[in-house]
């Protein structure tokens, strides 16, 4: 015969573990992730660091 108390207790433990994992995932997603394209641009097979806002003005001609 099924022991409903054990099944319910196990279900509650699983729910708590899932809740903990979701909270952890949420906190990781809320942290700022380094994006190299915020600080670099890619041209000619190389990454170049952007030193100022003038470096990314966008008026450069695209060269392959």
From Swiss-Prot:
Q: Which InterPro entries match?
A: IBV_3B
Look up the domain of life of the source: Viruses
Q: What is this protein called?
A: Non-structural protein 3b
**Lineage per the UniProt record:** Viruses, Riboviria, Orthornavirae, Pisuviricota, Pisoniviricetes
